[in-house]
Amino acid sequence: TPPPKANVLQAGSLLRSLGAIEEKGGITAHGRSMSTLPCHPRIAQMLLRADTPGLSSLATDIAAILEDRDPMPQDNDADLRTRVNALRQARGKGGNLREWGRIEKIAAQYRSMAKALTDNDIPAPYATGLLLSAAYPERIAKARDGCGHYQLSCGDNAFVDSADELSSHEWLAGAVMDSVSGRMFLAAPVDPEDLEDIASARSNILWDSRKGGISALRELKIGVLTLSARPIGGDIREAVLKAICDAAPKDGLSMFDFSDEVGNLQRRIGLASSWHPELDLPDVSQEALLNNAAEWLPAFAGNASTVAELRRINLCEVI
């Protein structure tokens, strides 16, 4: 029996997000490498992205912790680093690992698979989050406030307990979470600079009605989240004019100065058009001017990019 279509689509979406398959479904070179590892694609992704001995060892410990049941109390913090440090501390003492024994056995299997060394040092502060962001790119989270509420890169909302130290971090990488409530049970802080390699660059030149002018930013995005935004340099005049023209039908009444003088001229031309249709006079109503801004704005706008500058355009001359 074939699996449900929804499950197939979800699996395809995951594999594409991990770079394992192309948009049309063909396997990538990275996907072939992932397929050689006998583990979940997320874990395979994490093991392959761990490109230093220290990260490789850490990835095997994270994989083991995620595969087994959380050995720490439910009321403990959600920081995965706490579990990694506890595992390494128990392993470093040798002898009876007690509740960590099963997890260490799994970690040893992953070390063998990844040809990684045993490492009991405390990892770098953001190393755990870096690896989680590779395995769970759709669960990269940015704080909405300072009280534990986050937005995920996939657009969903998530949260950690406001008393959890994790809530003080602007960026988190989630691992284990409740998809219904959005609660993150295991996560780790991540340095946004570490995410730049998996971010996509977008140049956005658009009219910002709130600030009354053009916004021209080059953004680094992960899903719906913005990592950084910098002003776009160079000659962007053509794009600026297009953005103004695109906004004119909706916001034009506040962008341009439709003075009484302009209104009087529009009415006179409208009357002349109705009395003498043979003149075939153009429609110079507000709606027509704004809908057809691309026809006249380039000749009159100069370098205007704000409401104050656009309102200096003499619409009587335009008409």
Predicted stretch roles:
Residues E22-D51, S56-A63, G148-Y150, D156-A158:
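Accessory beta->alpha helical hairpin/"wing" motif in late/C-terminal subdomains of nucleic-acid enzymes
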Residues E22-K24, S153-G155, S162, R210, ...:
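Short acidic-glycine loop/turn motifs at beta-strand connectors
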Residues L55-H149, E170-I319:
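Acidic, serine/threonine- and proline-rich low-complexity intrinsically disordered segments
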